[in-house]
């Protein structure tokens, strides 16, 4: 069983990141790292279904959602497994990421290994935007950078 993973995110623009995942036993997954090149403010941060970046971030598919739920916030009962919420970039364009999530895993049916991590252009409305797109994607706009999550030593 994997206990650590890493993801290097890149896109067509200046946004890039290295994000680390760690899980002890069946406990929550700690997600930490730094994203650079963002505009100041909130940006949606999600695990997407496929580990396929052959056509850029669009080939990663929809949010990772094996339980067929509607999009929501990371603390909501109704959420996609891959819904990690927002990261906040300061005026320097840097977002320091520190998330503890009890829904994703590094093994089993909820495993994010081999899937794509994506940072988006806009803020995630956490499924509360009052329209169909909100309950699918959080109205977060384009995909700025992405990478496939892989097992690390």
Swiss-Prot record:
Cofactor(s) annotated in UniProt: Cu cation; Zn(2+)
Lipid moiety-binding residues (S-palmitoyl cysteine): 7
Entry EC number(s): 1.15.1.1
The protein's assembly and partners: Homodimer; non-disulfide-linked. Heterodimer with SOD1. The heterodimer CCS:SOD1 interacts with SLC31A1; this heterotrimer is Cu(1+)-mediated and its maintenance is regulated through SOD1 activation.
Post-translational modification: Palmitoylation helps nuclear targeting and decreases catalytic activity.
Modified residues (Phosphoserine): 102, 105, 107
Cofactor note: Binds 1 copper ion per subunit.
Species in which this protein is naturally found: Oryctolagus cuniculus (Rabbit)
UniProt record, GO biological process: auditory receptor cell stereocilium organization; embryo implantation; glutathione metabolic process; heart contraction; hydrogen peroxide biosynthetic process; intracellular iron ion homeostasis; locomotory behavior; muscle cell cellular homeostasis
PROSITE patterns found in the cross-reference section: SOD_CU_ZN_2
Cited CDD domains: Cu-Zn_Superoxide_Dismutase
Keywords from the UniProt entry: Acetylation, Antioxidant, Copper, Cytoplasm, Disulfide bond, Lipoprotein, Metal-binding, Nucleus, Oxidoreductase, Palmitate, Phosphoprotein, Zinc
Gene3D superfamilies listed in its UniProt record: Superoxide dismutase, copper/zinc binding domain
Protein's name according to its UniProt entry: Superoxide dismutase [Cu-Zn]
A Gene Ontology cellular-component term: mitochondrion
Reactions listed under catalytic activity: 2 superoxide + 2 H(+) = H2O2 + O2
InterPro entries xref list: SOD-like_Cu/Zn_dom_sf, SOD_Cu/Zn_/chaperone, SOD_Cu/Zn_BS, SOD_Cu_Zn_dom
């Amino acid at each position: 069983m994997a206990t650590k993973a890493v993801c290097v995110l890149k896109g067509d623009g200046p946004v890039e990141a290295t994000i680390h995942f760690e899980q002890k036993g069946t406990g929550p997954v700690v997600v930490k790292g730094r994203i650079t090149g963002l505009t100041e403010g909130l940006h949606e941060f999600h695990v997407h279904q496929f580990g396929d970046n052959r056509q850029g971030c669009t080939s990663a598919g929809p949010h990772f959602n094996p339980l067929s739920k509607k999009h929501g916030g990371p603390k909501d009962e109704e959420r996609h497994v891959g819904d990690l919420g927002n990261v906040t970039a300061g005026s320097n364009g840097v977002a320091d990421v520190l998330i503890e999530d009890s829904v994703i895993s590094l093994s089993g049916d909820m495993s994010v290994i081999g899937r794509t991590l994506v940072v988006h252009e806009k803020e995630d409305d956490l499924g509360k935007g009052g329209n169909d797109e909100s309950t699918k994607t959080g109205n977060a706009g384009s995909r700025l950078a992405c990478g496939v999550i892989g097992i690390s030593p």
